[in-house]
Amino acid sequence: MANGPTHQFLIFKIIPIDIGGIDFSFTNASLFMVASAVLSAGFLYFATSARSVIPGRSQSVAEMAYEFIASMLKEGAGTKGMKFFPLVFSLFMFVLTANLLGMVPYFYTVTSQIIVTFALALLVILTVILYGFIKHGFGFLKLFVPQGVPGILLPLVVIIEIISFLSRPISLSVRLFANMLAGHITLKVFAGFVASLGTLGALGIGGAILPLIMTVALTGLEFLVAFLQAYVFAVLTCMYLNDAVHPGGH
């Protein structure tokens, strides 16, 4: 159905590119990923390019975002984890900007695509693994051996810990993807009710009031969810990075 609630998630090619039978086309999803990266980086650049003792609104927002992520990273991974600040801050700003762009009518929500969120989650986990082995060598494997576990239970616990670790990119990506997908589908459904009832005359307009109120309320809620999901993604990233910095800390 062309105007169905899932139509907004369709991917179409803007610039078809085929190399050796592999599709590298530039799509609407690609466009909004680039837009999210450029807008977030551009905002931070212009907000901090003319720094002053008494900050303006844009500089205040940029500084609040910086302090917010810095505090989160220190709490989640300690002072040694601050070396990962550029990664966590970039991920937070990208996800937040992508989520907010998706709230604009007719714009594409790239975080509603599991392949996008999984790529971001995979980047986090690969960073944890690479840094863990580079910094600690095989000592990184202490991560899978919790302290205080009886020897008879250790093999089972190690298997559970490994499975839990490998499932992290799945849970991290699905959480973001599912929340954005479900929220936008719900908004589309209620907005569709309003549009359909509005065509039925006076009676329909009266019946459209409740769905309209619900749509406005859900829109406000989705803006909150857009921030919360970026926050949750960043918090979990900090927790996972803590395992790379302190593999024997649990």
UniProtKB/Swiss-Prot annotation:
TM region(s), chain numbering: 29-49, 84-104, 114-134, 143-163, 185-205, 208-228
Membrane-topology descriptor: Multi-pass membrane protein
Transport is among the record's keywords: yes
Disulfide partners: none
Gene3D superfamilies: ATP synthase, F0 complex, subunit A
Keywords associated with the record: ATP synthesis, Cell inner membrane, Cell membrane, CF(0), Hydrogen ion transport, Ion transport, Membrane, Transmembrane, Transmembrane helix, Transport
Cellular component aspect of the GO annotation: plasma membrane; proton-transporting ATP synthase complex
InterPro entries in UniProt: ATP_synth_F0_asu (IPR000568), ATP_synth_F0_asu_AS (IPR023011), ATP_synth_F0_asu_bact/mt (IPR045083), F0_ATP_A_sf (IPR035908)
Stored CDD domains: ATP-synt_Fo_a_6
Function statement: Key component of the proton channel; it plays a direct role in the translocation of protons across the membrane.
Subunit text: F-type ATPases have 2 components, CF(1) - the catalytic core - and CF(0) - the membrane proton channel. CF(1) has five subunits: alpha(3), beta(3), gamma(1), delta(1), epsilon(1). CF(0) has three main subunits: a(1), b(2) and c(9-12). The alpha and beta chains form an alternating ring which encloses part of the gamma chain. CF(1) is attached to CF(0) by a central stalk formed by the gamma and epsilon chains, while a peripheral stalk is formed by the delta and b chains.
The protein, known as: ATP synthase subunit a
